[in-house]
């Protein structure tokens, strides 16, 4: 957080010269800094000798992180995504065997096809889902040891745990957050929400503290937080089950009394 007004602070964080100096200051204070380029190195560090899956690892990267895990010596490497495998991915896995599972991480049946793996990576997914906690619950179902989560974020503000839900905001507010978030015009960010494109929409702008709270609720303990201006990478270990409420028979019976029969 900063003593500067939030719009000014976010504007400064988008300035290359200021951000370079600020990251130098962060490093001197012992903060661990992240970047998109560090992700394959984290994968190699944690996947060596382990089973690995990249959840949402097809769009824009053609399964590259799964191949990085295989190169690092993962015992098994796989990609899980809702989109079909790309031609580039299919070409590369002729030489390097990589499993592919097509499905939605929030679908409980996906865990039956993926199984429980040691290391799970999920990058660039969380803010594209209307229910990010359900994404983390799905990741917890398949994660046996370590989760590497990278997501777009906004800088911390005076209200820890804050987040902004983007769809259906008034246009002026959308433009305001677009300016402060440091992102180019995206669907539902500076533009109208389009339900027909589903997960291509940007649903959330979350602070890192919000993401960490969600992780802990889902049964993870954050061990490392690699900081960036408008992104965050978390390395978290499994410490317990995710909070999931399943109504028992008594609850269902009591609830049903409040509703008239459907005709």
What does each model-found stretch correspond to?
Residues 1-23:
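N-terminal, positively charged/glycine-rich alpha-helical extensions of SAM-dependent methyltransferases
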Residues 29-50, 68:
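Conserved alpha-helix/loop element of class I SAM-dependent methyltransferases that forms part
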Residues 51, 75-76, 146:
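Residues at the starts of beta-strands that form the adenosine-phosphate
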Residues 60-108:
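Class I SAM-dependent methyltransferase SAM/SAH-binding core
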Residues 110-120:
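A short acidic, Gly/Pro-enriched loop at the edge of an enzyme's catalytic core
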Residues 118-132:
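A short SAM/SAH-binding and catalytic strip from SAM-dependent methyltransferases
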Residues 130-262:
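S-adenosyl-L-methionine-dependent methyltransferase catalytic module, highlighting the catalytic core
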């Amino acid at each position: 957080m900063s003593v500067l007004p939030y719009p000014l602070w976010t504007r400064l964080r988008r300035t290359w010269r200021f951000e370079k100096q600020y990251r130098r200051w962060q490093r001197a204070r012992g903060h661990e800094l992240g970047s998109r380029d560090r992700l394959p190195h984290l994968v190699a560090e944690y996947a060596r000798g382990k089973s690995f899956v990249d959840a949402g690892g097809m769009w824009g990267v053609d399964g590259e992180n799964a191949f990085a895990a295989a190169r690092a010596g993962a015992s098994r490497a796989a990609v899980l995504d809702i989109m079909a495998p790309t031609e580039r991915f299919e070409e590369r896995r002729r030489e390097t065997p990589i499993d592919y599972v097509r499905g939605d991480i929030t679908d409980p049946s996906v865990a039956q096809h993926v199984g429980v793996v040691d290391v799970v990576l999920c990058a660039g997914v969380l803010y594209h889902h209307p229910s990010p906690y359900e994404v983390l619950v799905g990741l917890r179902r398949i994660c046996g040891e370590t989760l590497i989560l990278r997501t777009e974020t906004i800088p911390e503000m005076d209200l820890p745990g804050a987040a902004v839900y983007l769809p259906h905001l008034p246009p002026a507010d959308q433009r305001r957050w677009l300016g402060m978030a440091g992102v180019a015009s995206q669907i539902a960010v500076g533009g109208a929400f389009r339900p027909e494109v589903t997960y291509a929409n940007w649903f959330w702008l979350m602070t890192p503290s919000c993401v960490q709270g969600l992780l802990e609720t889902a049964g993870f303990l954050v061990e490392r937080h690699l900081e960036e201006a408008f992104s965050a990478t978390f390395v978290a270990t499994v410490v317990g089950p995710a909070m999931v409420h399943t109504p028992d028979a008594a609850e269902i019976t009591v609830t049903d009394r409040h509703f008239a029969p459907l005709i």
